[in-house]
Amino acid sequence: MGKRQDWSVTACIFLFLSLASQIHCRSHIPFPSPKRGVSSSGDTSHFNVIQRESVPSPKDKDLIQQLPGQPSDVTFKQYGGYVAVNKPAGRFLYYYFVETIKPGNTTPLVIWFNGGPGCSSLGGAFKELGPFRVHSDGKTLFRNPYSWNNEANVLFLETPVGTGFSYSNSPINGKQGDKATAEDNYMFLVNWLERFPEYKGRDIYIAGQSYAGHYVPQLAQIILHRNNQTLINLRGILIGNPSLNREIQDDFGYKFMFSHGLISQQQMDNYNKFCTDSDLYDWDKCHLASQKIEAQKTHLDIYNIYAPLCLNSTLSSEPKKCTTIMKADPCSGNYLKAYLNIKEVQEAIHANTTKIPYEWTSCNTKLLWEWNEKDRYVSLTPILQELMGKGVRVMLYNGDVDLVIPFTSTLAVVKTMNLTVVKEWRPWFTGGHVGGFTEDYKGNLTFVTVKGAGHSVPTDQPIHALNIFTSFIRNTPLPQTA
């Protein structure tokens, strides 16, 4: 009797396991499709169908469905969001990415930095080389036909932490500087490429302007030093109106003003006599001479000495009729600030998700003034020469009416590199007109001036800027004939 009970128990357990196994298998093995002409509705009504929702990837989450106020003729994809560069410290950099209007598996990736330090690359995106500009109402956008995404995929990065929408959850110990920024920028790029792996094998160019004369070569150097860890196919760097060596470049501002009739011969002579002549140097007289020259700047746009000042910062109730993008609006910065502080805009571009307790501004002046002073004056020419020695092409371009970083100051820095000229100074052309002048040096460095442009070349001369950019990434000479 005991054996029979044991057998019964064993049989029950076996039956239970058998049924459980069948149920388990049914949940994993799909049922065959019903035969043609036979309805399956009656056969499966007793089953509960469980549907699992797919979880969007970080890339999919960053997809911008539509920018508020954007034109209707947009065919390219846009992305925006945050990438962690130091999770334990809670440091996140914000990016805005526009794919090219001509998608392809080989179209290059360009990373763009504005300067400052502490100035947002969204200024570059919406005032310079991106696909849109902001109307005077601060609410709507219009197309920029000379956007660089005509030729490449363009990634705009707000860096360093504290710039624009980028933030840190932990206090930053000490002053920010070049080294930490370069590390953050490198970590951003590595992590961003994991989010967008289709760009890992692409040709990559790093570009920027002003203080990006530090960011760009320093990031490029880290990439080359660590390419045995993470391969990044860096092809070249392109920097506009670059800050490369302030000890040299700072001496050219007053000379530039004098050469353009902005100060008198007497003012220039007094400055030279009391400030630069070691035998006649007099601090009090030098200070007075400098003050008189600085006073002349108050009447000028120092970023483009021939541009009008913004005299009315009030937004218009309706967007002004835009007759041509070639005429830069001196108040465009006000329009952009208004646009990026609209709640719906921030939600659309996945920015300010942590509700930063301050509004977006084009430049963080606190960060600017607290930047490591030694870093401001470091010379970047040794890094440029290292990059060139490893096959990285370098182009430096400069607007010829910029007072902040005159083209003469950039050219002076290039001359200190003692490079051999392989193609002498000559004009280059856009649409039959002189776009500026250019000179080529041994080691793959090209210097370009841009006629009629100031500190932000793509703002002042968008056609010229696009031609320079296209020439660079295609590795073709600028047009040499009208």
Curated annotation (Swiss-Prot):
Disulfide bonds join 119-363, 275-286, 310-331. Expressed in seedlings, flowers and siliques. It holds the Pfam family Peptidase_S10. SUPFAM superfamilies: alpha/beta-Hydrolases. It is an enzyme of class 3 (hydrolase). Glycans are attached at residues 228, 312, 352, 418, 444. The active site is at residues 210, 402, 455. GO terms for biological process: proteolysis. It is found in: Secreted. Its EC number is 3.4.16.-. The keyword Acetylation does not apply. One of its GO terms (molecular function) is serine-type carboxypeptidase activity. Residues 1-25 form the signal peptide. The keyword Glycoprotein applies. Keywords: Carboxypeptidase, Disulfide bond, Glycoprotein, Hydrolase, Protease, Secreted, Signal. It comes from the Eukaryota. InterPro entries: AB_hydrolase_fold, Peptidase_S10, Ser_caboxypep_his_AS. GO terms for cellular component: extracellular region. Belongs to the peptidase S10 family. Probable carboxypeptidase. This is Serine carboxypeptidase-like 36. It comes from Arabidopsis thaliana. The lineage of its organism: Eukaryota, Viridiplantae, Streptophyta, Embryophyta, Tracheophyta.
